[in-house]
């Protein structure tokens, strides 16, 4: 039995979970999420909790067991609390502006980058160097944050670029002058 997969998921009062065919539908205060489930996994709702079991006992079913339990847990957490990732922009002249549904990032190049924010994601700016990405879908929040970060990854010499708030950048020492 999977150590993660065997744990039941408690359903809060404000959340409604439905299992229809191979779909798990989670509805809550913040919104609605849907997850497709493989045939080798069985999901049932009983006594105020979600239980994930596997039908088959092969290698793939064992792998999917823990995966789907984690995905459903993240869905329940997302519709109640939501998820957020924070990014910081470091560098002289590096800044971000929000206009409608787009972010405009000045990252040391001659032109600005325009990043269109997808549906289901909200972005908040704190000043012009802090970005907070929020939403109910953990995958989407992480994907949007990673796409914004990939526009200018932090470099190891001065740390210029876009980094996650909790990210530690390994710094390198620059070239030292040759002594004669």
Curated annotation (Swiss-Prot):
Xref: InterPro entries: Ribosomal_uL6-like, Ribosomal_uL6-like_a/b-dom_sf, Ribosomal_uL6_a/b-dom, Ribosomal_uL6_bac-type, Ribosomal_uL6_CS
GO biological process: cytoplasmic translation
GO molecular function, one term: structural constituent of ribosome
Ribonucleoprotein keyword on record: yes
Subunit description: Part of the 50S ribosomal subunit.
Function: This protein binds to the 23S rRNA, and is important in its secondary structure. It is located near the subunit interface in the base of the L7/L12 stalk, and near the tRNA binding site of the peptidyltransferase center.
HAMAP family recorded: Ribosomal_uL6_B
Protein name listed in UniProt: Large ribosomal subunit protein uL6
Organism (species): Borreliella burgdorferi (strain ATCC 35210 / DSM 4680 / CIP 102532 / B31)
Gene transcribed to yield this protein: rplF
